[in-house]
Amino acid sequence: IHDKRIDWTRINAFHMDEYIGIHPEAPQSFGHFLRIRIFDKVPFKKVNYLNGLAENLEEECQRYADLLTKHPVDIVCLGIGENGHIAFNDPDVADFNDPKLVKVVELDPICRQQQVNEKCFMTLDLVPKEALTLTIPALLKAEWMFCIVPFKNKAQAVYQTVYGEVSEKCPASILRRKENSSLYLDPESAERINL
């Protein structure tokens, strides 16, 4: 963030996923999470947020898709969920050939429970059941993908990403087919990987 060689005023930033029904200033909002850690710390040209409170969610998906088309993504920084999701592309809704760039998805129970386990929500009942997400093809349009995956609870998903079948059953497995894709692990998340 503090690298003086980067002219942040030339960069349009996007976030990849957002809960439906969560206020943008709520601590659980991914837009809020990114804003306080990154977006407020450097002078981006523009920061674009998904609106999980939009009255018409299909229009919101189209608005965001139009922005992504107007400002093609160069770099995606992402993680992997316990179920192998990238953004909110859980196994049941992931589609490697999705015709959409942004869509409404139903979150699977493993994804929702992860949010409780990580103390984002106190109980499963408080975790939204739906979210907005960039689709897998939208993510793969980026020139570069940097996937950062810490913590032991992600070790199985990392194993499936690296060694399992490339399929929507582990959405992150598609990263193996993406040129210019890098996976960064800590010792705990990498415990099942032969290095």
PLM regions with names:
Residues 71-96:
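Glycine-rich phosphate-binding loop
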Residues 6-77:
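Ligand-binding beta-strand-loop-alpha-helix segment within the catalytic cores
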Residues 53-56, 122-128, 161-162:
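Short, flexible loop segments at the rims of nucleotide/cofactor-binding pockets, characterized by
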Residues 87-134:
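Class I SAM-dependent methyltransferase SAM-binding "motif I" and its flanking Rossmann-like core
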Residues 1-7, 30-35, 91-101, 166:
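A glycine- and small-aliphatic-rich helix-loop capping segment at beta-alpha/alpha-beta transitions
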Residues 59-62, 87-92, 97-98, 157-161:
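A short secondary-structure junction signal
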